[in-house]
Amino acid sequence: MLRKVTVAAVCATRRKLCEAGRELAALWGIETRGRCEDSAAVRPFPILAMPGRNKAKSTCSCPDLQPNGQDLGENSRVARLGADESEEEGRRGSLSNAGDPEIVKSPSDPKQYRYIKLQNGLQALLISDLSNMEGKTGNTTDDEEEEEVEEEEEDDDEDSGAEIEDDDEEGFDDEDEFDDEHDDDLDTEDNELEELEERAEARKKKTTEKQSAAALCVGVGSFADPDDLPGLAHFLEHMVFMGSLKYPDENGFDAFLKKHGGSDNASTDCERTVFQFDVQRKYFKEALDRWAQFFIHPLMIRDAIDREVEAVDSEYQLARPSDANRKEMLFGSLARPGHPMGKFFWGNAETLKHEPKKNNIDTHARLREFWLRYYSAHYMTLVVQSKETLDTLEKWVTEIFSQIPNNGLPRPNFGHLTDPFDTPAFNKLYRVVPIRKIHALTITWALPPQQQHYRVKPLHYISWLVGHEGKGSILSFLRKKCWALALFGGNGETGFEQNSTYSVFSISITLTDEGYEHFYEVAYTVFQYLKMLQKLGPEKRIFEEIQKIEDNEFHYQEQTDPVEYVENMCENMQPYPLQDILTGDQLLFEYKPEVIGEALNQLVPQKANLVLLSGANEGKCDLKEKWFGTQYSIEDIENSWAELWNSNFELNPDLHLPAENKYIATDFTLKAFDCPETEYPVKIVNTPQGCLWYKKDNKFKIPKAYIRFHLISPLIQRSAANVVLFDIFANILTHNLAEPAYEADVAQLEYKLVAGEHGLIIRVKGFNHKLPLLFQLIVDYLAEFNSTPAVFTMITEQLKKTYFNILIKPETLAKDVRLLILEYARWSMIDKYQALMDGLSLESLLSFVKEFKSQLFVEGLVQGNVTSTESMDFLKYVVDKLNFKPLEQEMPVQFQVVELPSGHHLCKVKALNKGDANSEVTVYYQSGTRSLREYTLMELLVMHMEEPCFDFLRTKQTLGYHVYPTCRSTSGILGFSVTVGTQATKYNSEVVDKKIEEFLSSFEEKIENLTEEAFNTQVTALIKLKECEDTHLGEEVDRNWNEVVTQQYLFDRLAHEIEALKSFSKSDLVNWFKAHRGPGSKMLSVHVVGYGKYELEEDGTPSSEDSNSSCEVMQLTYLPTSPLLADCIIPITDIRAFTTTLNLLPYHKIVK
């Protein structure tokens, strides 16, 4: 995949954003997070979706932890082969797990590290994680592993727990892969539960804690693409997976990993390509050997090339409707001719298949040439992490990876191609027409490469100030004028933003309608703030405050998922010396005002590039970017503004540096228990007004706490208008808190407000010392809620854009349609959009909020370094401050679900973005009110299904890039589905539906022929996943909170699921699947159909893409069924009419 990043959280700015700030940003259109599984995540222009991933890191200066040793460089230890290897192990003697003292690590990090360099030049970092093994070292026997499992079982990990989602459980679901414009992530309970589920499922599927993991970074990326084969580096990243000389099966590595509870991924950046995987420890050595063949002797057979080109092309098609990717490609096009920043990194069928064929280029031969030239051992850095001794890991790595060839050629170097954007076209105003409804201004500077200044991190210092949201900040000033909603600035350190040729500094501001009309004034405000910083010069007080905050975070650093960790470390090995491998991208080491000042002084109007993104630009843009079809225009800066900015303009007295931060923790004492220790949360308060669950942490032993409350009200779901008013309320409350709570955020105290389906969710976490101050601030603002007419108008106008932007995405519309059919009394996004368009008043909002606060049931969970007495104070503060009455009767926090009739029902609707060829096809089978045992059996079924589903529908049939089966719990009602993201330019959605049915038929035969050994292996794999220990406290809290927020309270769910798994037989699996696929099966297909030649309009004519065009009227357009499925399906052409005739299933919780 091409690597994507999000801006924010600043990963881009590298300052940590508050949770609420991220939510506002998400709502208003600044991209703040992303996943990178061949996905496009997002960041503010210009680095919106380039290869790169979210590398949000805390930073810290910790001079007392610096090593006395020097960078070992070429003099570092070289692992020797054969007899030398034994000699090396013998030399260490009793220090069999001794790490390298040169490598600086956090005092909280229990792992051991060793650096080696193989004779072929490959550099490797070995990570031995023997924590929680009670002194065990070396290889354990299978019996010892079983003991280890039993010991760890009490931890009751969340990884594969049945996270029952009130909306629907998206287990094994990748449908957010391209959800890179997070402006549409509204704070709703389904998203709260989805977020919990995504975390658990991501760990189960991709980053399961305490799995063994490895990552390898090749120091070459898309910059090395030949001019006549754009996208070749990205294509090669795909092709090496397609079998090797030693293991020729095309899908063999994925199949091996799935069989043993693992996963893999890869990504291509400008100057790096990264591969990573995780797997159960028992199979780690074999997995390493299989994986290493990618780099030793991949087959890359001709037959696979044409099919995998389609996968790359589908990835590109999925990326095309993303404003992030469109802006990135436009920005790259501004580079000097011949500079690699201007290349088309994605690749597609045109560049990798059709054009080469036309020009007699042998793609297969060129692919192999590229591999031979650039996949050389001396360009590679490898990281492996496992519960093995360092000597064992060294032996394995030496034995396996020494086989990777070294061609002896110098690594490609692009450092001489500096100043890529030193062109007349850069310092202009670019108006761009977006896909989404949004107004945004991005100001960008191209600076000399900053990597060499990593010990000072000047751009981090600057971004910390530019992105500040407290008094005196840019955003505070613009918010008071109702011109802006969110601002992010900085450099995300992705390959697109920071490479050997330049570094970017960008400031992206989400504008209101009024702010769009005053965008020049907005830019002027930014320039005034920067001028103020330049006149004052770097401030040591500010630098040391950042150091203090980040020092706290580093010292009490929590562990991360192994696969994420090794991925990050293998990249860190490329630019950083040995002692800084773990810290180079996190810590601030030295205060050098001259370095900061040099970067700061370049941020002047005369060197800035301005991009104005707005639908209002439509009709004014006569240019079109080649690859993504982005409409844009180029203008000189208006004379009056250009003259002002070139003059010695005045400073703005409302802009100033932030005051000293009162939220920085200074007390890190671990508190004593004031009640008996418990394995799971216990209810310590239970009144008619609310209840509180509590668990004191005694496992991770860090001075942090998590506070979560759910304020439940029946008022919200009474009408679509009420749901919208609740969204407005939550977002105005977040807006009101942004400035006063920002200091807490930068002090590593985070909060998030979620407008749930049935109540307001408050989440607060961080160092426990000052956490009560933040919690009380939130509750105070909630109790005294108010809004001005200007803020109300600003938020409601933006909410219209947000709803619109959700609806134009095929994957989110498909989900909305599916849940509208299944969940009774659910208000769809279209209902909400219409209610908002019909008009709501500030008076109606204030009346709604008053009624909401008057009668509630409050449920909370407090975990961490907090006593039970302190925990009860949190609930008491909410009750006393809001002074509400209890609910008259108990209220369910889930919807009722309709019972689908037997048969195959199809709801086929037109996508709402006419410029989008992407279609989404989901085939869903409803099971019903089932037990926990049956849920676990369904999990096992989907785990069996995952790899053959990918192999059949993507690899062999090439139907689309995103292909996945899913376990679903829709308000407690079980089901499973298969989803394919395809394109109307390639396939009719009903062809895809039939192929899904074809796959399920073949899968039935596959599991019938499954051997007992293969069945037991998969059962063991799922058990192992569920037995994995939590990496940090937040994971345990997520799992427990999921039980509380869904009112199921089965805190030992994993133990029950493991017990169920041990009782299953192959016949249980086969019979369950057949029962749901038989004549009485309840099947629902949802098709959201894109625009392209294989799909028809309502009048029967072929549809076509209309770039940059969306339907202004947000309503479902039902499409007729084609003859392909007409004989076997029951069409749904009116959802309300269909569902009103159906029976309702009872409320159901999966607790037995």
From Swiss-Prot:
InterPro entries linked: Metalloenz_LuxS/M16, Pept_M16_N, Pept_M16_Zn_BS, Peptidase_M16, Peptidase_M16_C, Peptidase_M16_M
Catalytic residues in the record: E237 (proton acceptor)
Keyword entries, A-Z: Cell projection, Hydrolase, Metal-binding, Metalloprotease, Mitochondrion, Phosphoprotein, Protease, Signal, Zinc
Positions of post-translational Phosphoserine modification: S86, S94, S96
Signal sequence range: 1-20
Annotated localization: Mitochondrion; Cell projection, Dendrite
Keyword Transmembrane helix: no
Cofactor binding, per record: Binds 1 zinc ion per subunit.
Top-level lineage group: Eukaryota
Listed Acidic residues bias regions: 141-198
Family annotation (SUPFAM superfamilies): LuxS/MPP-like metallohydrolase
Region (Disordered): 81-108, 133-208
Catalytic activity: Hydrolysis of polypeptides, preferably at -Xaa-|-Arg-Lys-, and less commonly at -Arg-|-Arg-Xaa-, in which Xaa is not Arg or Lys
Sample GO molecular function, one term: metalloendopeptidase activity
PROSITE patterns referenced in this protein's UniProt entry, alphabetically: INSULINASE
GO biological process, one term: positive regulation of myelination
Pfam families in UniProt: Peptidase_M16 (PF00675), Peptidase_M16_C (PF05193), Peptidase_M16_M (PF16187)
Binding site for Zn(2+): H234, H238, E315
Function (record text): Cleaves peptide substrates on the N-terminus of arginine residues in dibasic pairs. Is a critical activator of BACE1- and ADAM17-mediated pro-neuregulin ectodomain shedding, involved in the positive regulation of axonal maturation and myelination. Required for proper functioning of 2-oxoglutarate dehydrogenase (OGDH).
Subunit structure and binding partners: Interacts with BACE1 and NRG1.
Record family assignment: Belongs to the peptidase M16 family.
Full protein name: Nardilysin
Source species: Pongo abelii (Sumatran orangutan)
